[in-house]
Amino acid sequence: LKNHAKNVKLFLDKDMTAQIGGLIVAKRPVFIAEPGIGVAYKTIMVDFPWFGGFARVQKEKCVKSLHDAYRGEHRGQKVLEISNYSSESLGVALSAFNLAIRNGKGKNFTVECIFQSSKIFADGGPYKDLLYCSSKEAKKDIRLKTSGQLKSFALNNQLFPLEPKTFFYNWVYINTLVKNERLALEILDYDAFTDIAFNPN
């Protein structure tokens, strides 16, 4: 794969995939933990063979392909896919669709529902009823696409700006994770993390 990439200029589509001969190649980020002062991680983009299709098994093949490509250059590192397509139960539990925090009334809210229900648009929001939907329903709610430009986020009577990018999402995720002590400890066993569905484009 690396030799092909040296000789062929890749023209990536919106899904960050390209074709080299008969091989479909994708590019996805790998987030590498770097504990210490300042930014605690770095991001690298990795090229890997892509398996097209909507079936779950195809996504799982893509995850394995991405991890194999990464470990080929970073031997000995433990990589965890954080999504419902993870082969490890920890990765599934850490997905934003599943990782949840419990309020004082005993109700669980997932990271995804908190994030989507906090969006303020030019023409509406925040839609707090999304807290009580499934994560999938919250993400696909039509109002998130028909309420104009995203302006900010609101949570617990506090406003959050759009910049720095991903700040609010990261803040929600980290604050939810620390409330799940077992998961927060288990994640420390890994060196790098992926989300096969995440496309930075």
Language-model region placement:
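Charged, low-complexity intrinsically disordered segments
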Residues: 123, 142-144, 188-196
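Short amphipathic alpha-helical segments, especially helix-boundary/capping motifs
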Residues: 73-74, 146-151, 182-188
